[in-house]
From Swiss-Prot:
GO terms for biological process: heme O biosynthetic process. It comes from Wigglesworthia glossinidia brevipalpis. GO terms for molecular function: protoheme IX farnesyltransferase activity. It is a multi-pass membrane protein. This is Protoheme IX farnesyltransferase. InterPro entries: Protohaem_IX_farnesylTrfase, UbiA_prenyltransferase, UbiA_prenylTrfase_CS, UbiA_sf. Pathway: Porphyrin-containing compound metabolism; heme O biosynthesis; heme O from protoheme: step 1/1. The chain crosses the membrane at residues 8-28, 35-55, 75-95, 105-125, 130-150, 161-181, 205-225, 230-250, 265-285.
Amino acid sequence: MIIKFIQIIKPGIIFGNIISTIGGFLLASQGDINVNLFIFTISATAILIASASIFNNCIDKDIDIKMQRTKNRAIAIGLISSNIAYIYALILLILSFLLFLKTNFLTIFISMLGFFIYVFIYSLLMKRKSVYSTIIGSLSGATPPIIGYCSVKEHFDIGAFILLCIFSFWQIPHSYAIGLVRYNDYKIASIPIFPIKKGSFKTKINIIIYIIAFFISTIMLFFAGYTGNNYLFFSIFFGLIWIFIAIKGFKSSEENFNIIWGRKIFLFSIVIITAISILISIDYKKNI
């Protein structure tokens, strides 16, 4: 049973977001790391994401049971009651907030705003109704690196804005690719994702547009003076590979091809965002 309580906080998602949070923190620190601040920021962010994940599972339990990918989730099948899950999530939210008090007001505001957007605006209000819910959700998905960055800087500057662009633009092709791979799941659950409402061709066009926007944003971090030459080289290298993979999506519109292609877009999205997070952690410019 303990394993089920661990599973509903989605450890994989926490891990991925913590990598980007560390990236933002180290980019802002420029080698001068406040260890206590680092521990509080990373811990608070991880716990906040865990809380948001549980709230999301509770809200989505009726649609999770319909989808092949999510039908065995503990809350969906009743192994963990919604009331217990909500209490669990609320305790984690309070604990996260208390840890964030060790940072600064801006970091607290950004973290709580990201939580609010994900749980209330995306999960509760838009996911079942709007084809553009992914775009709204991308804003909350982009908050972890900004939390890490602003916990150090204590202000929202051009660096934070570029991070917002990078991680927001990344979220959309990442999510649309999942939509193509799990198209039938979302259709059965009546979730109006972009691939279902707009079709595969428009989805592929949008994936390319957002990948290019992501690519430009990653480069801007260099030209704004935040990162070094190694970052520029590898961000261009990985970015061009992702664009190349995306362009190949127009070879066919068959469902099986879309699933295979969507999986490639999805998998490489994880590779590239991990690479970017690591690069901003180690190849930063000082005195920015």
